[in-house]
Amino acid sequence: MGNTCRGSIGGKTFQGYTQPEDSSCSTNHNPSSGNSYSSSDNFSPTSNAQQNSNHKKEHSLSLVSPRKASMNRSGSNQAYYVMGHMTPNIRDLYTLGRKLGQGQFGTTYLCTENSTGAEYACKSISKRKLISKEDVEDVRREIQIMHHLSGHRNIVTIKGAYEDPLYVHIVMEICSGGELFDRIIQRGHYSERKAAELTKIIVGVVEACHSLGVMHRDLKPENFLLVNKDNDFSLKAIDFGLSVFFKPGQIFTDVVGSPYYVAPEVLLKHYGPEADVWTAGVILYILLSGVPPFWAETQQGIFDAVLKGHIDFDSDPWPLISESAKDLIRKMLCMQPSERLTAHEVLCHPWICENGVAPDRALDPAVLSRLKQFSAMNKLKKMALRVIAESLSEEEIAGLREMFKAMDTDSSGAITFDELKAGLRKYGSTLKDTEIRELMDAADVDNSGTIDYGEFIAATVHLNKLEREEHLMAAFQYFDKDGSGYITVDEVQQACIEHNMTDVYFEDIIREVDQDNDGRIDYGEFVAMMQKGNPCIGRRTMRNSLNLSMRDAPGAQ
C-alpha cells in the first residue's frame, strides 16, 4: 500500500491525512468547478456506481479546503443570460434522464439526444447560486475553455451549452468507467510501466492545455475519468472550472487548487502554467507510492511541507523504484518554476518514452500546425472555413480570440508579418522567415498584407468543426446563391470577389472538387472536399499533434 507510516490514499492509517482540519487557505470559490473543493461536490459525467463512492471519499482523502460559508465578493446576481445570448431549449434537443451526481451548484444527469439516441452527460448549474459577476464569468469561461480544447482524445468533449431561466446546461460526452482516484484506492499504487503510461496521458493533457494558452490549475486524480472501466488508459480530463486563459509571461496571484497538489509558487501568489507540471508530478508520486509527497495532519501543515519541498524517497516502496522515475519526479517537483521541466520535456524524459527513446524533434506549435494545414487548402475550402468561422459562437472561439490578441501586439486588429514571426517564435517555432512568409500569404486570403481577425480564426480553427452538419450546410448555402443545390463557376467567382481573392482560376476549383464531371459542385462533393485531408477527423482527433509551445515562451515557465 506504499508508505503506511505517513498515511495512505485510502486513509486507513492517518485520518489527519484524509481530512485536514485547518481551513485557513483562501482558495478560490468557483461555481463551475464540480470537484474543486470537495471530492463529494461532484459534477463528473459518470455512472451511478462512481457517484455512490463519494461518501467513501469523504472519509478517505479530502484533497481541498472546505468552502467558505460566506464569500467576500462584490457584485450583483447573475445576468439574465449567463452565456450572453439566447440558446436553443435543451429539452427540444435532449431528454434528461436519471441523476448521475449532485454538487453544491447543480446536478449531473444522463441525457439522450433526441435525434440520434446517443447518450451524454448534462451538467446543470443553478443560476440562482451564481451570486456575483465573477461567478457568471467563471461558468462562461469554463464553457469557452471546453470548446477551445475540444478535439483532444484525453479531454472530455463538449457537445453544447444551453441556458434557460433557471439553469446553464453543459452537455458533454459521458465517461462511465469511474475515477482515476478510485483506481488508485483499489490498487494502492501502480507498476512503473503503468504509472508511466498514465503520466504520459496526464502530462499530454497539460501540454495540450498550455499549447493552447490554457492553465488548468486543478489537476488531480478525481478530475480524470475513465471512458471504459476495463481500460485503465481511457482517461479523460473532465473539470475546467478553475482553468484560465493565459499569455506567455503572465503572472497569476489568486490561490486556487487543492492542498496536496498545489505548487509552492501558487501559495506565494506568483505563478504561471509551470504550476500544472508540479501538480502532475504530485500525481506521479501518488501513482507510484499510494501517498502524496507533501502530507500533514492540518491544511497549514500541508502548505508548510509544500513550501519546504522535501521529497521522501527513502520509505517503502521507493527503494524498489527506478532512479529514472525518481529523477523525473525531482525535475517535476523542482522548487524553482524556471528550472522545472516543461510538459513537453516531461514527455521526452526517458522514463516516459517508450523504450527510452525521446522524440527526435519538437512538435509543431498548434497555431503553426493549423496554418500549415490551411496553406495547403484550395481557395474554395479557405473561403468556406472563413464562412464557418464567422458562424461560430463566442464561446467556441474565445480561446482563439485570446491567442489573436496575444499576437496582435499593437492592438491594430490585424497581425503583421513581424507580429506573426515574433508570436510564432515566442511560442516555440523555429521556422525561417521565408517559411513564415509563405504561411502569412496563405492565411492572408484578401491579400491585404496582414492577417485580420476573421482570417486568423478561419486559419486556426480546429478542423473538428468541419464535422458538424449545420456548419457544412451553412457554408454550402453561402456559395449556392440561387439555392439550386449546386455551386457553379459563376458562384465561385462571385464568392472570390466578395473575399477580395485574386489570381483564382475558377474552372480549376470546380474541376478539383467536381467528382462526377458535370461542371458544378453538389453538396456531397462539397462535404468530401471539406473533410479531405483532415487528420483524424472525428472523435479520434488528437490535439497532441497540434502543440503550441506557449510553455517554452520566455517568462512563461
UniProtKB/Swiss-Prot annotation:
One of its GO terms (cellular component) is membrane. A lipid is attached at residue 2 (N-myristoyl glycine). GO terms for molecular function: ATP binding; calcium ion binding; calcium-dependent protein serine/threonine kinase activity; calcium/calmodulin-dependent protein kinase activity; calmodulin binding; protein serine kinase activity. Ca(2+) 1 binds at residues 408, 410, 412, 419. Residues 1-72 are annotated as: Disordered. The active site is at 218 (proton acceptor). Residues 28-48 have a biased composition (Low complexity). Transmembrane segments: none annotated. Residues 358-388 are annotated as: Autoinhibitory domain. It is a lipid-anchor. Belongs to the protein kinase superfamily. Ser/Thr protein kinase family. CDPK subfamily. There are 3 contiguous domains conserved in the CDPK subfamily: a kinase domain, an autoinhibitory (junction) domain and a calmodulin-like domain. The autoinhibitory domain (358-388) inactivates kinase activity under calcium-free conditions. This is Calcium-dependent protein kinase 4. It comes from Solanum tuberosum (Potato).
